């Protein structure tokens, strides 16, 4: 074969290989496009939630062409529908309390970016439970932490994060902006309410499904405020207790009934309760009960009983002689269902809770009568109705050598149980005013739930060494 023939033969071979390579590439491209359309055209049928993965791998070593395609498609059950929560189950029997979660936020914040918060709570939805709190818009180690002892500022926001973690700028979800809040899930979506603005003209913004739906102006011009723990929904109706007016005199309290973030009805407070703030609410047996703070007079807590079906309420005081506000006098010989029991100094009150279920009733309170230190749970049968009722069982939650703070009720209404299991949290306040060597005021959280077993006591205190922050 002469040189010209060799050149022609080599050229023809090269062109043939190039054409073959081109055809393979075109075929591979067509296959990839076909797979994409095939995955995207999933028929609309009721099938289980599954992950399907289609993989195509093409390797042409002779021409150094490598093509790897990995397509993952998540197919959701389009016919799956959520339903409104229905509060028909009773409360579970409780003989003691087991630990659920403790976030250790202050301990972790000594060496990490942890948000300064207060007024925390927990609230659950069909997927699980989350922690909530009002952030101060800064971290424990941030310079803006100076002055966070103040309750109201334009830098506060309701944030939520995964239960058990410490709140940080990296895991916290902003629910709404404000310095007073409540939040609850109706089984379909979450409603969150935040108050913000100046003391004499604050307003509330109601969010539902991640969007603002309703705005509420101040009606008394004196710090419009709400529960600082979760609200509760029944068949889509979510009552919320709000107060506007003096903290140490008669104020204007309203029970506002929402559905999907929109106002259905507004009621002025009726009944025996003389002052209402910071209610802790739970639902069972078709009824919602809110145990509140009388910041004006009472060391016994006011109770609001709400019928969400017909959107009405009544109010009275916890009848038991076991007083649960702080500060408070010594427990008297008799309780009072119809009027506040006065006494105690210097603090006018603290947010608290109770579960009122006949013989299965439990009350929470600080161990100290005069300050927010220690915490205990007392089983007090018929505390709601019996002025002679006293404790038959006791469990320490935080010892009296450590600070506590606000406390409140919550329930995982979607747990797979035949009854609603009561749960509660305790705010563990650190920093100012009691610990003035640091510039900030913040908290960690401990949460416990009911147990039919008889479990022992332990102190679930905050545990941070303030000296490490100096």
Swiss-Prot record:
Q: Which residues are glycosylated?
A: 51, 54, 62, 67, 70, 86, 146, 201, 402
Q: Region Hypervariable stalk region: list its residue ranges.
A: 36-88
Q: What is this protein called?
A: Neuraminidase
Keyword set for this entry? Answer: Calcium, Disulfide bond, Glycoprotein, Glycosidase, Host cell membrane, Host membrane, Hydrolase, Membrane, Metal-binding, Signal-anchor, Transmembrane, Transmembrane helix, Virion
The compartments listed are: Virion membrane; Host apical cell membrane
Q: What does this protein do?
A: Catalyzes the removal of terminal sialic acid residues from viral and cellular glycoconjugates. Cleaves off the terminal sialic acids on the glycosylated HA during virus budding to facilitate virus release. Additionally helps virus spread through the circulation by further removing sialic acids from the cell surface. These cleavages prevent self-aggregation and ensure the efficient spread of the progeny virus from cell to cell. Otherwise, infection would be limited to one round of replication.
> Hey, which family's this protein in?
Belongs to the glycosyl hydrolase 34 family.
**PTM comment:** N-glycosylated.
Membrane topology qualifier: Single-pass type II membrane protein
EC no.? 3.2.1.18
Organism equals: Influenza A virus (strain A/Duck/Czechoslovakia/1956 H4N6)
Entry's Gene Ontology cellular component terms: host cell plasma membrane; membrane; virion membrane
Supply one GO molecular-function term.
Answer: metal ion binding
Catalytic activity as recorded in UniProt: Hydrolysis of alpha-(2->3)-, alpha-(2->6)-, alpha-(2->8)- glycosidic linkages of terminal sialic acid residues in oligosaccharides, glycoproteins, glycolipids, colominic acid and synthetic substrates
Q: From the UniProt entry, list the residue stretches annotated as the region Involved in apical transport and lipid raft association.
A: 11-33
């Amino acid at each position: 074969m002469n040189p010209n023939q060799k050149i022609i033969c080599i050229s023809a071979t090269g062109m043939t290989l190039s054409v073959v390579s081109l055809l393979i590439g075109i075929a591979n491209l067509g296959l990839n496009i076909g797979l994409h359309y095939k995955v995207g055209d999933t028929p609309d049928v009721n099938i289980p939630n599954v992950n399907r993965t289609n993989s195509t791998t093409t390797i042409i070593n002779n021409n150094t062409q490598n093509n790897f395609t990995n397509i993952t498609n998540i197919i959701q059950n389009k016919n799956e529908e959520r339903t409104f929560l229905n509060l028909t189950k009773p409360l579970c029997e409780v003989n003691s309390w087991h630990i659920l979660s403790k976030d250790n936020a202050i301990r972790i914040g000594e060496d990490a970016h942890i948000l300064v918060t207060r007024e925390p709570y927990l609230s659950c939805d069909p997927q699980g439970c989350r922690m909530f709190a009002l952030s101060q818009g800064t971290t424990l180690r941030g310079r803006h932490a100076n002055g966070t002892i103040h309750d109201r500022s334009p830098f506060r926001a309701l944030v939520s994060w995964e239960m058990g973690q410490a709140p940080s700028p990296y895991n916290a979800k902003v629910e709404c902006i404000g310095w007073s809040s409540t939040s609850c899930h109706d089984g379909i979506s979450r409603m969150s309410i935040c108050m913000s603005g100046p003391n004499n003209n604050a307003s509330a913004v109601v969010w539902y499904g991640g969007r603002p739906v309703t705005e509420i102006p101040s009606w008394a011009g004196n710090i419009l405020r709400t529960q600082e723990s979760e609200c509760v929904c029944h068949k889509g109706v979510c009552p919320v207790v709000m107060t506007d007016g003096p903290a140490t005199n008669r104020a204007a309290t309203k029970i506002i009934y929402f559905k999907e973030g929109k106002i259905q009805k507004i009621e002025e407070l009726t009944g025996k309760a003389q002052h209402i703030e910071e209610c802790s609410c739970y639902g069972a047996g078709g009824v919602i009960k809110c145990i509140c703070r009388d910041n004006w007079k009472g060391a016994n807590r006011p109770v609001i009983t709400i019928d969400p079906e017909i959107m009405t309420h009544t109010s009275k005081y916890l009848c038991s002689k076991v007083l649960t506000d702080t500060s408070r006098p010594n427990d008297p010989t008799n309780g009072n269902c119809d009027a506040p029991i006065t006494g105690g100094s210097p603090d006018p009150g603290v947010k608290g809770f109770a579960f009122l279920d006949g013989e299965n009733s439990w009350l929470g309170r600080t161990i100290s009568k005069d300050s927010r230190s220690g915490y205990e749970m007392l089983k007090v049968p018929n505390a709601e109705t019996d002025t002679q009722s006293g404790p038959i069982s006791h469990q320490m939650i935080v010892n009296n050598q450590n600070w506590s703070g606000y406390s409140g009720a919550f329930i995982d209404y979607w747990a797979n149980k035949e009854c609603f299991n009561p749960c509660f949290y305790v705010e563990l306040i650190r920093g100012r005013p009691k610990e003035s060597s640091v510039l900030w005021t913040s908290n960690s959280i401990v949460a416990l739930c009911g147990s039919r077993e008889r479990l022992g006591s332990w102190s679930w205190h905050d545990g941070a060494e303030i000296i490490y922050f100096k």
